[in-house]
UniProtKB/Swiss-Prot annotation:
Protein's GO biological process: lipid catabolic process; phosphatidylcholine metabolic process
Family statement: Belongs to the phospholipase D family. C2-PLD subfamily.
This protein's name: Phospholipase D alpha 1
Record-annotated C2 domain positions: 1-125
Positions of the PLD phosphodiesterase domain: 326-364, 654-681
Organism: Ricinus communis
Cofactor(s) the protein requires to work: Ca(2+)
EC number assigned by the record: 3.1.4.4
Gene3D superfamilies according to UniProt: C2 domain, Endonuclease Chain A
Length: 808
């Protein structure tokens, strides 16, 4: 049967299955259970039935497990499914769970073409076996389905039409009004870095300084400092700009937190317990998070630091539980403090929160200059970070790995949502109940309340999103029936908050003109990958973001309208670039890009347009290259001969690591958080994440382009990356703009990768070194099989031994 495009939302209810066995007793089940017992040796088995929803081979929903209800399992569970798939059937699969996996009972098929008219289908569907014959008891499953095609959504392609936009629906946290947001590029910005960027109302863009603001927030807290991190390192200092000193600014983070705790401030920290850092695997952990050092530093002090493993929610199989605790992480990066009132009321306090991509750890402090060699005797002498070369050290010299990141400060009612997220996580994994009871402090700390009036031109509406499940957050509903009411999704016996993915999907679907993404990873929608050397259905990187982006571009090509997607990723994911895990991720990235370019090329041909697909979708990375200056730090030792390290040192170049997790849509809406564009971050039941989505109701892209803080922030980022500003940057969707940016990035790539170097690189934005063939295949750029100075393939390589769940 022909595959039909499903792009929109599917509402599905799975009610029950009737007569799963006939009058002859549950023979089928007895046999099944005996087989499982024999195979596994797990003792007497019980039936554990669950049902799944698949669009062809992509799993889009699953019910809870029902124990010992062999003949008439009744789930009565509803699902709200975003779809961007090709499918001929919606498939309902009934399975019996066991400790190692699951046994198929049968499948029921509802043809997609019956859904297209948007009418509700409510029916009993026959359950068939592998050969498409009815299972022997003539059993049926009762389901209800209704499909809402994306163009029927009144927000499709309309942007945020007014200040009455209610936010992303079906989420745990609703949108908050009257907030204030500060946007940060990098941990620090020196004075006078940003040129004049005009905003609406005759104003100019003013940058903020992240680690200075975090330092002030911690220093001035009087009641509580709550921190979560993938990594927190006590030895770093937050203040390092000699031109902007602060009283007490030379203190390390660890000493600052101890000092605040000794003053009576409640300091609580949840730091990911990197299980790989235990025992023989590796002394400093696969990812060197310093988790045990940090715990040790705060022992017997007033700071309560809890190492927090990524525990699975109850109900996974033995194998799944092992996967979650050893493969997945706590990735949220938040700081929550009490703070003075903006009006100077010295008695009352409010809550202020920070959310984004920056961990408070080593290797993160940087400025938009992203120097490789010139800060090695100052800001980075005691914070030399270079995990891409074995044995790299300050003694052997640069290049260090520069770090580009994005973060935010949230004030107003949204800040309390971040606090509530911390409280949920502490109650689940923090051990002792040490949380400050705000009710007892209500005469001091105000309740959640706006920090700006709705008619203030600088006010923000903000919504908090997460990827997290009941294994990491206390207070999620116990039953799947209650999950949708709380804006949550039910999984196989766990309740999941997957709202970060929902927020991205909604923002892409609303987009009118352009999308600008910076992210540490870009892979997913594996249901759309070519089966070249893999079985796409085995990969399970099913989040929709890449496919939603290409479907958005396709809709614009069909309508004859301009639309451009700009995506900035690192040259390679941090680590030894030749290693199997880095190469595997690059392979998934290539497959994702290729799926999108094939979609675009097909659409251009169908519409008779001859144009470079890179005018619609274009990928970049960041890099720097510096000539040697007199008076530069001279290392005492040299790297080993014939290594990537010595080659990069001699060529005076290295990538700038893009760690950001940000998307800007039409200069009116921004998402910033900890979540990467991969399955780990978007799944909800893998890495735990947090993000915010925000806009300024008085600066929407309705009648004319938006010129609020988000526009200023994007222009400031483009200035950082390109070393200049151009009039065309005001309209990123225009052919003039995308051609200009692509040309500059190609020029900078040529300078970066050339044999010789006469001047510093004039900008950091480099063309991602791939080609796009006439059918959309992603190819090597001529002469660029490997990244400069390495033997690491740009297009990556499939790993034969690392499971996809680890690298997607």
């Amino acid at each position: 049967m022909a595959q039909i495009s499903l792009h929109g939302t599917l509402h599905v209810t799975i009610y029950e299955v009737d007569k799963l066995h006939s009058g002859g007793g549950p023979h089928f089940f007895r046999k099944l259970v005996e087989n499982i017992e024999e195979t596994v040796g797990f003792g007497k088995g019980v039936s554990k039935l669950y049902a799944t929803i698949d669009l062809e081979k992509a799993r889009v929903g699953r019910t809870r497990i029902l124990e010992n209800e062999q003949s008439n399992p009744r789930w009565y569970e509803s699902f709200h499914v975003y779809c961007a798939h090709q499918a001929s059937n919606v498939i309902f699969t009934v399975k019996d769970d066991n400790p190692i996996g699951a046994t198929l009972i049968g499948r029921a098929y509802v043809p997609v073409e019956e859904l297209l008219d948007g009418e509700e289908i409510d029916r009993w569907v026959e359950i068939l076996d592998e050969d498409k014959n009815p299972v022997h008891s003539g059993s049926k499953i009762h389901v209800k389905l209704q499909y809402f095609e994306v163009t029927k959504d009144r927000n499709w392609g309309q942007g945020i039409r007014s200040s009455k936009y209610p936010g992303v629906p079906y989420t745990y946290f609703s949108q908050r009004q009257g907030c204030k947001v500060s946007l940060y590029q990098d941990a620090h910005i020196p004075d006078k870095f940003v040129p004049q960027i005009p905003l609406a109302g005759g104003n100019y863009y003013e940058p903020h300084r992240c680690w200075e603001d975090v330092f002030d927030a911690i220093t001035n807290a009087k009641h509580l400092i709550y921190i979560t991190g993938w990594s927190v390192y006590t030895e770093i200092s937050l203040i390092r700009d000699s031109r902007r000193p602060k009283p007490g600014g030379d203190i390390t983070l660890g000493e600052l937190l101890k000092k605040k705790a000794s003053e009576g401030v409640r300091v609580l920290m949840l730091v990911w317990d990197d299980r790989t850092s235990v025992g023989l695997l590796k002394k400093d952990g696969l990812m060197a998070t310093h988790d045990e050092e940090t715990e040790h530093f705060f022992q017997n002090t007033d700071v309560h630091c809890v190492l927090c493993p990524r525990n699975p929610d109850d109900g996974g199989s033995f194998v799944q539980d092992l996967q979650i605790s050893t493969m997945f992480t706590h990735h949220q990066k938040i700081v929550v403090v009490d703070s003075a009132m903006p009006n100077g009321d010295s008695q009352r306090r409010r809550i202020v929160s920070f959310v984004g991509g920056l961990d408070l750890c080593d290797g993160r402090y940087d400025s938009p200059f992203h120097s490789l060699f010139r800060t090695l005797d100052s800001a980075h002498h005691d914070d030399f970070h270079q995990p891409n070369f074995a044995g790299a050290s300050i003694e052997k010299g640069g290049p260090r790995e520069p770090w580009h990141d994005i973060h935010s400060r949230l004030e107003g009612p949204i800040a309390w949502d971040v606090l509530f997220n911390f409280e949920q996580r502490w109650r689940k994994q923090g051990g002792k109940d040490l949380l400050i009871q705000l009710r007892e402090l209500e005469d001091v700390i105000i309740p959640p309340s706006p920090v700006m009036y709705p008619d203030d031109f600088e006010a923000w509406n903000v919504q908090l999103f997460r990827s997290i499940d009941g294994g990491a957050a206390f207070g999620f509903p116990e039953t799947p029936e209650d999950a949708p009411e709380a804006g949550l999704v039910s999984g196989k016996d766990n309740i999941i908050d997957r709202s970060i993915q929902d927020a991205y999907i909604h923002a892409i679907r609303r987009a009118k003109n352009f999308i600008y993404i910076e992210n540490q990873y870009f892979l997913g929608s594996s249901f759309g990958w070519s089966p070249d050397g893999i079985k796409p259905e085995d990969i399970n990187a099913l989040h929709l973001i890449p496919k939603e982006l290409s479907l958005k571009i396709l809709s614009k090509i069909a309508a004859g309208e301009r639309f451009t997607v700009y995506i900035v990723v690192p040259m390679w994911p941090e680590g030894i670039p030749e290693s199997a895990s880095v190469q595997a991720i690059l392979d998934w990235q290539k497959r994702t890009m290729e799926m999108m370019y094939k979609d675009i090329v097909q659409a251009l041909k169908a519409n008779g347009i001859i144009e470079d697909p890179r005018n619609y979708l274009t990928f970049f990375c960041l890099g720097n290259r510096e000539v040697k200056k007199s008076g530069e730090y001279e290392p005492a030792e040299k790297p080993e001969p014939d290594t990537d390290y010595i080659r990069a040192q001699e060529a005076r170049r290295f990538m700038i690591y893009v760690h950001t997790k940000m998307m800007i849509v039409d200069d009116e809406y921004i998402i910033i958080g900890s979540a990467n564009i991969n399955q780990r971050s978007m799944d909800g039941a893998r890495d735990s994440e947090i993000a915010m989505g925000a806009y300024q109701p008085h600066h929407l892209s309705t009648r004319q382009p938006a010129r609020g803080q988000i526009h200023g922030f994007r222009m400031s980022l483009w200035y950082e990356h390109l070393g200049m500003l151009d009039e065309s940057f005001l309209n990123p969707e225009s052919e003039e703009c995308v051609r200009k940016v692509n040309q500059m990035a190609e020029k900078y790539w040529d300078l970066y990768s050339s044999e010789t170097l006469e001047h510093d690189l004039p900008g950091h934005l480099l063309r991602y070194p791939i080609g796009v063939a006439s059918e959309g295949d992603v190819t090597e750029l001529p002469g660029t099989e490997f990244f400069p100075d390495t033997k690491a393939r740009v297009l990556g390589a499939k790993s034969d031994y690392l499971p996809p769940i680890l690298t997607t």
